[in-house]
């Protein structure tokens, strides 16, 4: 895959990948999972994680697109982001429009976009009747990425649940931060591999958002099990937070019995992170990570050559920015700040 993209670097690529074959260095996990045609078709699949604010209809469909491609998603439902969503404008109940869902990642993502646009926007639209007939049955082989298809049922349930949230609103109302969060969690519920959930999420919210702070209290796992799809973390701006506020929030975390919300300290409320909180990310940016296995390091020189190999592979990965489906801002941001992460694993061995 890399040699095909960078033929002039063939010799160095082969040399550095000997470290991978010897288990001394690891490229991004997604590049190991989807190397070849999957990444050539959708370069975003080389990246482990991404971050975006939920501030437009496209944010919902892009989240579905990224999760189905194997990328973990950090997202912001901070008040100043969710407020940018247009008010609810319910579709005409007596005017119907059929939408045939394509049997692809893009097709599933488009179904979310069409649903959200039918409820959010300036113009009142027809009600959407979704046609799932083109989606391959459960257990069918996925030719490009491998594995087996989940069938249409997870997407059907996702659309029904999201529609339920939207129908509970009245025209002119805005989605709340918690409702926006729940919609993203319903999207994650639809992302399955072998019948098992495979979506990773972290939801960042405003520190004074009481609904989000308490969304995992009580028997939430029975009444709102979708909320288990995401870690929820309050964004605390370092130069604004007070000890009293922090301790009050900490007490609420203890009382929740769930260990949440988490606390995400930041200097800028526009920056987010990936679900593992390994790195600060700009809005619409990907996390590019390689790892060095340090469990059997023999010398400083040994460590140096491994880090050099990992940095080289990370640089190759950073060049995969010819995204499709995603808005242009994704490519602009990822190229402007081409992250090259090199971490260490095996320190405790």
Map each language-model feature to its residues.
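Extended catalytic cores of very large enzyme megasubunits
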Residues: 1-349
């Amino acid at each position: 895959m890399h040699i095909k993209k960078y033929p002039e670097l063939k010799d160095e690529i082969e040399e550095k990948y000997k470290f991978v074959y010897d288990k001394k260095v690891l490229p991004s996990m997604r590049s190991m999972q989807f190397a070849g045609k999957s990444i050539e078709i959708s370069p975003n699949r080389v990246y482990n994680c991404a971050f975006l604010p939920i501030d437009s209809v496209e944010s919902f469909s892009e989240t579905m697109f990224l999760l189905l491609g194997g990328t973990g998603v950090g997202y912001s439902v901070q008040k100043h982001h969710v407020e940018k969503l247009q008010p609810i404008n319910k579709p005409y109940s007596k005017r119907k429009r059929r939408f045939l869902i394509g049997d692809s990642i893009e097709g599933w993502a488009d179904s979310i976009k069409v649903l959200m646009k039918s409820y959010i926007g300036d113009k009142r639209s027809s009600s959407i009747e979704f046609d799932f007939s083109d989606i391959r049955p459960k257990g069918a082989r996925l030719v490009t990425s491998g594995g087996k298809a989940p069938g249409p049922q997870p997407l059907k349930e996702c659309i029904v649940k999201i529609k339920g949230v939207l129908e509970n609103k009245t025209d002119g109302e805005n989605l709340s931060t918690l409702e926006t969060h729940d919609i993203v969690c319903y999207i994650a519920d639809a992302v399955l591999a072998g019948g098992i959930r495979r979506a990773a999420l972290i939801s960042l919210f405003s520190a004074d958002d009481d609904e989000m702070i308490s969304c995992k209290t009580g028997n939430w796992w029975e009444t709102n099990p979708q909320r288990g799809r995401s870690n929820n973390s309050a964004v605390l701006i370092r130069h604004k937070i007070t000890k009293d506020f922090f301790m009050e929030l900490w007490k609420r975390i203890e009382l929740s019995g769930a260990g949440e919300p988490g606390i995400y300290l930041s200097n800028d409320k526009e920056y987010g992170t990936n679900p593992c909180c390994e790195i600060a990310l700009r809005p619409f940016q990907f996390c590019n990570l390689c790892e060095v296995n340090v469990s059997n390091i023999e010398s400083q020189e040994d460590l140096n050559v491994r880090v050099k190999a990992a940095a080289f592979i990370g640089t190759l990965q950073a060049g995969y920015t010819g995204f499709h489906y995603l808005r242009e801002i994704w490519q602009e941001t990822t190229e402007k700040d081409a992250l090259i992460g090199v971490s260490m694993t095996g320190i405790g061995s």
